[in-house]
């Protein structure tokens, strides 16, 4: 990818591109997506953006308006709530049982829906819990959305990082007849370890893709030209990508298993992640004196043990903390040893 970026620079690829991205990259994204879905996808369905975050932001602004409610599985990535707020829509948290790693089902959706519900955001594998939805679980959720006429925004940025086989994409679940209300967002930041290159994309109906590109034309215009060429190289050399991902997954699995063992031996409650690279750790029971134990523990770990974690309140889960194991193995294991030694007060 770095060599591809050098070649692009040498060739003078420093000008604007189409707002939606260079045609070869969009075609490569469409071809990859088509392998996961019976119905064909082409470049006109794809908008390349400055990371998956921008793709989600574009979708929220293009689809939702003041008064619209969007269901958000909770605990969930903090930016979902903020993006919807900026778009003047209302984020409605939906939470499944702890025993199911908080995954939602038809029952939770039916309880949360109102006549103002217009959409649903899904994230599998999940940040922060690492939960992965099975095909049957996704089929149940899609059925509810189809019946209600909701849009589904499926954030699949962690799809390549799964410890229980291959994570199911909604592209392979949603029927082609209902694909018109499905937006997939993905990118290179996680499974290709390219967060700084700022390349993400959305896949959706052509009319929506045009609206999202029009919106993007007034914010950032095209994603960085050089990064687009690097991304094309990454998506084109599938053998090299699979080999690199397999090596990365071996290391991530070692970190996950080692860190999980240390924390559980220390008596901490930890959700076992099936995907992504986070451990969700229980920080204690919320009380009137300590309504956000995750915040208190995160501050204590940073101030007294030089360990940085994310307080669960960022994900609407104040009794938890999120521990990343994306850092070097030695740092991860030392960090979780300190967390285990600190315990829960």
Show the residue positions of the predicted features.
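A short helix-loop-beta submotif of the ANL/AMP-binding
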Residues: 86-91
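Conserved PLP-anchoring active-site segment centered on the Schiff-base-forming lysine
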Residues: 62-84
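Short acidic capping loops at alpha-helix termini that bridge into adjacent secondary structure
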Residues: 40-46, 67-69, 116, 179-182
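N-terminal small-domain helix-loop-helix segment of the aminotransferase-like
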Residues: 1-51, 58, 108, 237, ...
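Conserved glycine-rich beta-strand-loop-beta hairpin in the small C-terminal domain of fold type I
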Residues: 232, 246-260, 270-284, 319
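Conserved core segment of the aminotransferase class I/II
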Residues: 4, 175-250, 344
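PLP-dependent enzyme catalytic core of the Aspartate aminotransferase-like
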Residues: 290-309, 313-345
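Active-site phosphate-binding strand-loop segment of PLP-dependent enzymes
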Residues: 92, 96-171
